[in-house]
């Protein structure tokens, strides 16, 4: 499946305590994207998305808005070859 890609994403702003991770998980599952999401100690959210190029790029775009109560300031994404993540989970 050569059309699969991986995006490693860092989201800054008011993104913790606003259901950002849960909304990310739910949206990724709706789009059949594999990966994970977690809060970082510095206040950012880190996520990995794997799936078809179009779906992953769409998910990275979604991160700019995120959950309804979030206030996203920046989204940094790096693309790479997929590592074979299966399913989508919230990591703690």
Swiss-Prot record:
Keywords: Hydrolase
InterPro entries documented for this protein: Acylphosphatase, Acylphosphatase-like_dom, Acylphosphatase-like_dom_sf, Acylphosphatase_CS
PROSITE patterns: ACYLPHOSPHATASE_2, ACYLPHOSPHATASE_3
Keyword Nucleotide-binding: no
Superkingdom per UniProt: Archaea
Active site: 21, 39
Ranges of residues in domain Acylphosphatase-like: 6-92
EC number: 3.6.1.7
Coiled coil: none
Enzyme class: hydrolase
Catalytic activity: an acyl phosphate + H2O = a carboxylate + phosphate + H(+)
Xref: NCBIfam families: PRK14444.1
Record's protein name: Acylphosphatase
Taxonomic path: Archaea, Methanobacteriati, Methanobacteriota, Stenosarchaea group, Halobacteria
